[in-house]
């Protein structure tokens, strides 16, 4: 924002307070937080509150990590859809079909069958 936009009062739905100084006010009991939203910087002055580190959704560079939270936090906004997982069926009819196919493929006439377990998660 340039100086002309800061001095122009906004619409009637918001409260306009002229800036008191151009330098951020930071004392042990007062912090100023700047939040950037779509090219607009919002400045919040928080006085009489405790310090707390909060992780952000975006990773921050080492210089800005003090202001934006922890550095190298993954960006959670770009979640890729997970590929569909293969679910094994516990249907006895499907097990018999696969067992029959398996017996046709094998050439040994008498092979001992082992029990298979299907575990549902």
UniProtKB/Swiss-Prot annotation:
Which Pfam families would you find in this protein's record?
Answer: CAV_VP3
Q: Which species is listed as the source?
A: Chicken anemia virus (isolate Australia/CAU269-7/2000)
**What does UniProt give as GO cellular component?**
host cell nucleus
Keyword line: Apoptosis, Early protein, Host nucleus, Host-virus interaction, Inhibition of host mitotic exit by virus, Modulation of host cell cycle by virus
Where is it located?
Host nucleus
Protein family: Belongs to the gyrovirus apoptin family.
Compositional bias of kind Polar residues? 58-70
Record region (Disordered): 1-28, 57-95
Name assigned to this protein: Apoptin
Primary site of residence: host cell
Role played: May act as transcriptional regulator. Induces apoptosis in infected cells. Element of infectious replication cycle.
Please state, per the UniProt record, what induces or represses the expression of this protein.
VP1 and VP2 are detected 12 hours post infection, while VP3 only after 24 hours.
- Extract one GO BP annotation from the record: symbiont-mediated perturbation of host exit from mitosis
